[in-house]
Swiss-Prot record:
Biased composition annotated in UniProt, kind: Basic and acidic residues: 51-72, 194-217, 366-385, 478-487
GO molecular function term, any single one: mRNA binding
Main localization category: nucleus
Family designation: Belongs to the nSR100 family.
Record-level GO BP terms: cell differentiation; mRNA processing; nervous system development; regulation of alternative mRNA splicing, via spliceosome; regulation of RNA splicing; RNA splicing
GO CC field: nucleus
Keywords: Differentiation, mRNA processing, mRNA splicing, Nucleus, RNA-binding
KW Nucleotidyltransferase (keyword) present: no
Protein name: Serine/arginine repetitive matrix protein 4
Gene source species: Danio rerio
Residue ranges with Basic residues bias: 73-88, 102-120, 128-184, 454-477, 526-539, 560-574
Localization of this protein: Nucleus
Length: 574
């Protein structure tokens, strides 16, 4: 208590410099009252010495009592005493005390105090407010000058960027159309040429890679065909070596398998949404083929090293549109157990772009065809497993070799059937037909709610499903202020949702590519594949996927027919 009073006393003395030299012990009522009483005794002593100073001090005391004291009785007492004292001092020394000078001093003090009190809180925010108003007025002026569309889209630089993007996308889509038309023309012309001309051995190039090309003009035209198609269309290279029991004679042929994309490519182009996906179109991600070697039981990937990284990400081209991700379904081919470092070393070691497959050249055809039935097992990064078993029926004596393969995984089912028909043992491969049928099945929504870490493609689809349901986001989409910010940040990450009309789809595609490898052998091969995928989910416990593929090949020269049926059943437990 005493310490607090002492501190107040010191402050009071600081504020009024030289008002009093010694202060008596304060009364319990107030410090100010005690100081006034003490000051009275001091002034009585000092009145003959300096009446001018005394007058100033008295008036200052009167001010203090008026401002700081709230008790009316004390105020009255002070006023009465000070009035008596004032009269005495004025009558005693009228000539020595001019009044206007102390009044002006007091007024100055009062005005300074008022300025300190009232202007100190209000001075600091006022210039800030003015600045803010100026800023907002500038913005409004800018918006008034610009059109409403400009206001929504933002500055002119953003508009320019958008226009450039649109122009690029348009040019890209035009180039795709041109490539498609060229493909169709080249395919028809090359098929006509290849039927009439001979080709013994051929090597193919993928992309810009070169390899040795042996043979006639028909093979060169086929090479041109594959060069143009390989980068844009789903085209797969497979090398199959069939050798008889005699080691001296070897028949080597490299055959191109082209998917007839007139039916499926149109769908893919229609469903590909170029407005939102910043990655390259899905058709550029398709350099992956899986060829099963029966002798060694190995898998080898015929792909360029640039495209290997596409298989690592789960959402390679999955932009919410189900058909866009068809071509990235070669993903499970590039897993740890399938792709060895030997493939890379062979790719580097051999000539600049020639793809090699581990095929035992010394084995006869019968041994190769005997080991045709083998199950394959792939493990995914998210823990989903898929098994596919291919059963092929073939006749050993006629040398017919037909294979069918189907792979179903996760939410996608991929089935491929290829049939090889051989004229005789010593002749090499005469015709190859491959058919690929892919379908995408949509899973139910309650599975997405429960299963959070399914895969990144599921996550993107989950976002696209849930987005339109919430009214908050609808409101945000309509309002221009939110629209601008969201468009800049998240357009590249999240795709526009695309809804499939039905949960299970069956697609059919047939491809015919046949040419004459030897002058005596003329063969025509047709392959049909029908693949179905069903997706069930009973309270997110498990989901099953089935895919059936059927392929039939017919050789017109020997009038023999070989059929192959493949059935794949995959169950993924959650």
């Amino acid at each position: 208590m005493a310490g607090v009073q002492q501190g107040e006393k010191q402050l009071f003395e600081k504020f009024w410099r030289g008002t009093f030299k010694a202060v008596a012990t304060p009364r319990p009522e107030s410090i100010i009252v005690a100081s006034i009483t003490a000051r009275r005794a001091v002034t009585k002593l000092e009145t003959p010495v300096g009446p001018k100073d005394d007058e100033e001090k008295v008036k200052a005391k009167d001010l203090v009592t008026k401002t700081h004291e709230k008790n009316g009785h004390i105020k009255r007492r002070g006023r009465k005493r000070h009035s008596h004292r004032r009269a005495r001092s004025v009558s005693f020394d009228a000539d020595l005390s001019p009044r206007p000078v102390p009044k002006t001093k007091k007024k100055k003090k009062k005005s300074q105090r008022k300025r300190r009190r009232h202007r100190s809180p209000s001075c600091s925010p006022s210039p800030v407010r003015k600045k803010k108003k100026k800023k907002s007025s500038k913005k409004r002026k800018r918006h008034r000058s610009a059109s409403r569309k400009g206001r929504h889209s933002g500055s002119s630089s953003r508009r320019k960027r958008k226009e450039d993007k649109k122009h690029k996308k348009r040019s890209r889509s035009h180039s795709h159309r041109r490539h498609r038309h060229r493909k169709a023309e080249i395919r028809s012309s090359s098929c006509m040429e290849n039927r009439s001309e001979d080709c013994e051995k051929s090597g193919f190039r993928d992309g810009g890679r070169s390899s040795d090309v042996h043979g006639g003009d028909a093979c060169r035209s086929a090479v041109k065909l594959t060069n143009k198609i390989s980068s844009k269309c789903c085209c797969h290279f497979s090398e199959s070596t069939v050798s008889p029991s005699r080691s001296g004679v070897e028949g080597l042929s490299k055959v191109v398998i082209v998917q007839n994309s007139e039916s499926s490519d149109g769908k893919r182009r229609a469903d590909y949404d170029s407005g939102n996906d910043t990655s390259s179109p899905p058709s550029s991600k398709t350099g992956i083929t899986r060829s099963k070697v029966a002798g060694n039981g190995k898998f080898s990937c015929l792909t360029s090293p640039e495209k290997l990284r596409l298989a690592d990400g789960d959402n390679a081209s999955d932009s919410g549109n189900s058909l866009t991700s068809y071509d990235s379904l070669g993903k499970p081919l590039l897993r740890e157990n399938t792709l060895h470092s030997s493939v890379f070393s062979k790719l580097k070691g051999e000539e600049s772009g020639r793809f090699c497959v581990d095929v035992e050249k010394t084995q006869p055809l019968d041994l190769i065809s005997d080991r045709n039935r083998s199950p394959s097992h792939d493990r995914y990064e998210d823990g989903t497993r898929s098994r596919s078993r291919s059963i092929s029926s073939q006749s050993r004596y006629s040398g017919r070799h037909s294979r069918s393969r189907s792979l179903s995984s996760g939410r996608r089912s991929y089935s491929r059937s290829s049939s090889y028909s051989l004229a005789s043992r010593r002749d090499s491969l005469s015709s190859v037909s491959s058919c690929r049928s892919l379908n995408h099945s949509r899973c139910t929504t309650h599975r997405f709610r429960e299963r959070k870490r399914y895969c990144s493609s599921c996550k993107s689809r989950k976002h696209s499903r849930r987005r339109p349901s919430s009214p908050m986001r609808k409101r945000r989409r309509d309002s221009p202020s939110h629209l601008e910010a969201r468009r800049i940040t998240s357009a590249r990450k999240r795709p526009i949702p695309y809804y499939r009309p039905s949960p299970s789809v069956s697609s059919r595609s047939s491809s015919i590519l046949s040419w004459r490898l030897f002058p005596l052998t003329r063969s025509r091969t047709r392959s049909r594949s029908c693949s179905r995928s069903r997706s069930r989910s009973h309270s997110h416990t498990y989901s099953s996927y089935r895919s059936y593929s059927r392929s039939s090949s017919w050789n017109s020269l020997y009038s023999r027919r070989s059929r192959s049926r493949s059935r794949s059943y995959s169950r993924a437990r959650r």
